[in-house]
């Protein structure tokens, strides 16, 4: 799913170097995953997990949920599926006792920026380059 979504967004092939990052999200012991399927075909996914200090390299930050691996099939872009998946992650995060949420998304992905700001996320002004050299922007919100 993530590969099809990224290939459409990047208008080319999604780098295989992203595979370990997505797998890492899914294998994280604190992770909770939501999947949207249509007759057994995955159409979208989103993951929530314990947020960590130092941009994911440090110790857990109490009360912080990291939202990651939000991917939607390109033919479902704009129909609300991504928002429903993010809403499900945020609702589950609250149920688990998280009090805030954060995420990183490509700085040039206007569709993602609209999705997250509609759900109460605000850009913090922090940006960095990910391990593949793409500029990503940080967002957060209270739960």
Task: Show the residue positions of the predicted features.
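C-terminal "cap" of GNAT-fold acetyltransferases
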Residues: 34, 63, 99-102, 106-113, ...
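Local beta-strand/beta-hairpin segments that build beta-sheet-rich folds
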Residues: 43, 124-125
């Amino acid at each position: 799913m993530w590969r099809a979504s990224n290939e459409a967004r990047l208008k080319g092939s999604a780098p295989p170097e992203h595979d370990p990052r997505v797998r890492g999200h899914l294998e994280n012991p604190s992770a909770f995953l939501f999947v949207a399927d249509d007759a057994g075909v995955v159409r979208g996914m989103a993951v929530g997990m314990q947020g960590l200090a130092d941009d994911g390299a440090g110790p857990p930050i109490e009360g912080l949920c990291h939202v990651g691996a939000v991917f939607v099939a390109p033919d479902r872009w704009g129909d609300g599926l991504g928002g429903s998946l993010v809403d499900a992650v945020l609702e589950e995060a609250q149920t688990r006792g998280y009090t805030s949420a954060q995420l990183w998304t490509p700085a040039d992905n206007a569709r993602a920026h609209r999705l997250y700001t509609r759900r109460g996320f605000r850009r913090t002004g922090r940006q960095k380059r990910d391990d593949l050299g793409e500029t990503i922007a940080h967002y957060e919100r209270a739960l």
